[in-house]
């Protein structure tokens, strides 16, 4: 464990202060460490956007070889991303990017979605490694899921969108293919989601239990092809693995899903990642003048490869 006593002349964001002290703590590493409760500010877990001041105490439960990794690697991790992010929308406040399946949104590796976004912004002349603010993820997608992710370009956008997403004000719609045709073809699923931390999965239960969170998922069948169904799914709540667990709970798991799916079918069809795409984002009405232009806008990712194949009947 490392204990840092903050020494700075002016209030500084927690993530920026830590990066100044340990350049190896990339945005991905910082986000991962925070999720794992490895960063404490004055004894408590705090958002990375929190301003630290002289006299504050930071505890880091991070291995020394991670903290000192900058001595072995030249430059920030985003410079080593394989390619700039595929941008769907760009404005002064946010980026909306299309995440490929198989790319992590963040983490210790170089080629993450966030690093691809930083590389894009650097090439546009909008971001440099010593900037006071580092663009940040506003929400996450599982590594195997493709689709739209919002990245804040300003502290104000980060605060606003984190709040809007937490309060379910941003409407998210997904496309997916299930192994099995759901009956009825259109429905709203309820229940409670319970995490199994030891196995890294979640399960849907009918009755409320300690630690379980209420979930609601709405689906609509677009087309069927043999054993498969193409669905449009709307998240009413937004929990870990919610769509994957909910569809599996009714006997129609997402095709390609190795955790909740039918692995023999996945092998037969040679699918590496789940056929799940965060396809559509619809913005709420914003009253803040700097964000009013985004009110009610809807954004779409390109339709995934399996969409047309189910419509054509070539994937079945």
Predicted regions located by residue number:
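Short, surface-exposed secondary-structure edge patches
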Residues: 47-51, 232, 273
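Short, well-ordered beta-strand micro-motif
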Residues: 59-61, 232, 282
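Long C-terminal interaction/binding lobes of large macromolecular proteins
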Residues: 219
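Secondary-structure transition/turn motif
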Residues: 99-102, 207-209, 233-236
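Pseudouridine synthases involved in rRNA/tRNA modification
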Residues: 1-32, 64, 80-85, 201-203, ...
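Short histidine-centered loop motifs in beta-beta connectors
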Residues: 43, 226, 231-234
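Short beta-strand micro-motifs in enzyme catalytic cores
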Residues: 95, 174, 229-231, 277-279
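RNA pseudouridine synthases
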Residues: 1-197, 224, 302-311
